[in-house]
């Protein structure tokens, strides 16, 4: 887990707000400030979660990369991202998806007033497809530790539900983990569930822990699991499955099928996910996180 000398970062819920042509610059012309921040955080996510090796950037065991190397990566360099930009994301974003901390090699005094990128390391707190050891990146959640939340929820979509059932549960898909939250966006939870999720799958975490499934907690409060040895979080651990905004009745309860989705329900792939992105796990992300 991150040490005490660090900054937490959020990379806004990337709901992809409509973009005008004037939104592509460095915050000039077209009111692009917000749009540029989203561009920067998306680029950071892509690099630190998925593309570090391809970019020639070595992550340490905890998923950290040298900030100076990150800032010269092509997409970020083309955006002319500065240390101030990174620090702004660290201090002002709500999703807390990144952590920035002093580089103990180049900044042994752990000076957090430095504005030199080489003095810092940065990581994505979760959402990786790059293989990292969960124990180095995340805090374990155990029955013995008494830290199992009262509710653990996974957000999914009508489109994926039949495949979730057919495959026997949720899967990480292209990510290392299935992502869950302790509540919904309406309840003020900002990490762990997409704002457009249509289904709420409540997980019986205690039963799954007893069944040998490992659970983890990220620095930004996202609950994560790799599933069982086959990479599946079984439907037998589905405590309750209901619609989030549209009443579809109870689909699953206490590990048992109750009903199918209602006939005539409007079903379409969620934004940013389609037949190629879908699959048995319903995307594994549950947010956008």
Whereabouts are the PLM-identified features?
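Eukaryotic, polar/proline-rich low-complexity intrinsically disordered regions
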Residues: 1-289
